[in-house]
From Swiss-Prot:
Species annotation: Saccharomyces cerevisiae (strain ATCC 204508 / S288c) (Baker's yeast)
Miscellaneous field: Present with 1730 molecules/cell in log phase SD medium.
One annotated GO biological process: vesicle targeting
SUPFAM superfamilies: Ypt/Rab-GAP domain of gyp1p
Protein name, entry field: GTPase-activating protein MSB4
Highest rank taxon of the organism: Eukaryota
Pfam families in alphabetical order: RabGAP-TBC (PF00566)
Effect of R200K: Reduced GAP activity
Keyword vocabulary terms for this entry: Cytoplasm, GTPase activation
Length: 492
């Protein structure tokens, strides 16, 4: 599976003629390709340089795009190289194009360094898509964190995640699962949920749209359905869970269908265990671990979490001071209403696509602890907006009076008390900051170079071993809480 060379150019990714010829009559053979394969031109015998070939392909693809513009979209330049709309609610197309002009140069420089790095390690490039990578070293980690070339990502993710080992141990399983699905093995509940979510997957991506000239569904939608249904049969403990459609949808842009299936198995079983089960307890455990990390690494935000724990209905009269014991692990703070979805989606839709893909590079190379680093990095970058919110300023002043022993007779205290919102209203204001801030992180380097790649940043102390220990601790704490809250049996 080879991604088209045009994918690394500034040109928007647009269909070529072969796609139009085959889309309407696609069958299960499309399972052997990723969407990117469908845009690959066959230029056997072309001995021109990589740069020259890119320029030729770019011109050719743009000319083809112009011929079919009236059929498929208003302007192909409105879409990025993966088929996503450049324009969003928080980012204009002008902002995107200005950023991309410079970032594209960055990716080209990085790719040349990758090529030299692999050749130095005696690894062949295999038609500009390496199949293997060097042993894990600090140097390789730096390369991954600075971004894997877009056209290499499918094979790189597969290699780093151990996908081939998973496939080799389960030869023929995916085909059998598809056969079982055709025989009615998918539960009615899962089937209904999957069908409902298919066309909700990346509504701003051209590959997931059914165009008027197509007789059937887009190939990627059919692949998405098969993978999700097969997984619901493969792991009945999980079945289908919302957000899986986005995980698989993104994987299908970079790899063939069966590989996308096994990558989903790896994500749900290895990287985020228990997160997608029906009770979502694994998701709650991970949020508890995140709260522990906030307590250790982000004291200003932790101070807000402490002050927000109350004994009653949210009245500001009932602020109780620092959260006691393990309460915050069992009654998770409000901000986890946002951050839980960050983990379940692996940041798909949380940050712009280039930033998402850089996060995925590191997820598959470094495992799930990197998701915690990213979450903390986003919170750190948004900290100033978080703390500058009007309600936070008032709460800090109010808390200083409350814990300082002031009473209702204090005139300043009374004025603050009248101005301040309820804790629920304050939390909603904070949630809006946390929800909106990451959507502006168009440039991956804004979080990677400013926070995640700095040598002296405390977040470097977060390892996979530390996260796994945290998961065990939080799970036990939550189990203790549940056990203590059960009514005791009466003695006979």
């Amino acid at each position: 599976m080879i991604m088209s060379s045009t994918m690394s150019t500034e040109a928007a990714l647009v269909p070529n003629e072969s796609v139009f010829d085959t889309v309407s009559s696609f069958n299960e053979d499309d399972a052997n390709y990723s969407v990117l394969d469908l845009y690959d031109d066959d230029d056997e015998g072309d001995d021109s340089s990589t740069v020259e070939r890119k320029e030729i392909l770019t011109t050719r693809e743009l000319e083809k795009a112009k011929a079919f513009t009236s059929l498929i979209m208003a302007d192909p330049e409105n879409f990025d190289r993966y088929g996503f709309s450049k324009k969003g609610y928080f980012i204009s197309q002008e902002e995107y194009d200005k950023w991309w002009t410079e970032y594209n140069r960055y990716t080209e420089r990085r790719k040349k360094k990758w090529e030299n790095f692999l050749l130095k390690n005696k690894i062949e490039l295999h038609n500009d898509n390496p199949l293997v990578y060097p042993a894990r070293t600090d140097e390789l980690s730096k390369f991954v964190r600075k971004g894997i070339p877009a056209e290499w990502r499918g094979n790189a993710w597969w290699y780093f995640a151990g996908g081939q080992r998973q496939l080799d141990a389960n030869v023929g399983v995916y085909d059998r699962l598809k056969s079982d699905c055709r025989e009615g093995a998918v539960s009615g509940k899962d089937m209904e949920a999957i069908e409902r979510d298919l066309y909700r997957t990346f509504p701003d991506n051209i590959h997931f749209h059914k165009e008027s000239f197509q007789n059937g569904e887009p190939a990627i939608i059919r692949s998405l359905r098969r993978v999700l249904m097969a997984f619901s049969v493969y792991d009945k403990t999980i079945g289908y869970c919302q957000s899986m459609n986005f995980l698989v949808g993104l994987l299908l842009l970079f790899m063939e269908e069966e590989k996308a299936f096994w990558m989903l198995v790896i994500i749900t079983g290895k990287y985020l265990p228990g997160v997608y089960e029906s009770d979502l307890e694994g998701a709650n455990v991970d949020q508890g671990v995140l709260v522990l990390c906030i307590k250790e690494y982000l004291p200003e935000i932790w101070s807000h979490i402490e002050s927000s724990y109350m004994n009653g209905n949210g009245s500001t009269d009932q602020i109780s001071g620092p959260a006691s014991g393990e309460e915050y692990l069992c009654r998770l703070p409000t901000l986890t209403l946002c951050t839980a979805s960050w983990f379940m989606s692996c940041f798909v839709g949380v940050v712009p696509i280039e930033t998402t893909l850089r996060i995925w590079d590191c997820l598959f190379y470094e495992e799930s602890h990197f998701l915690f680093k990213v979450a903390l990095g986003i919170l750190k970058l948004s900290e100033s907006e978080f703390l500058e919110s009007k309600s936070q300023k008032l709460f800090r002043q109010y808390s200083s009076y409350t814990f300082g022993g002031s009473n209702d007779s204090d005139s300043t205290f009374k004025r603050l008390k009248n101005k301040i919102k309820t804790q629920e209203e304050a939390d909603m204001e904070i949630l809006q900051v946390i929800q909106n801030f990451p959507k502006r992180l168009l440039n991956p380097n804004d979080i990677f170079e400013k926070v995640l790649m700095k040598k002296k940043v405390a977040l470097n102390g977060i390892t996979q071993e530390k996260i796994d220990r945290g998961r065990e601790y939080v799970a036990m704490a939550r189990n203790r809480q549940r056990a203590s809250s059960r009514p005791k049996e009466r003695r006979k």
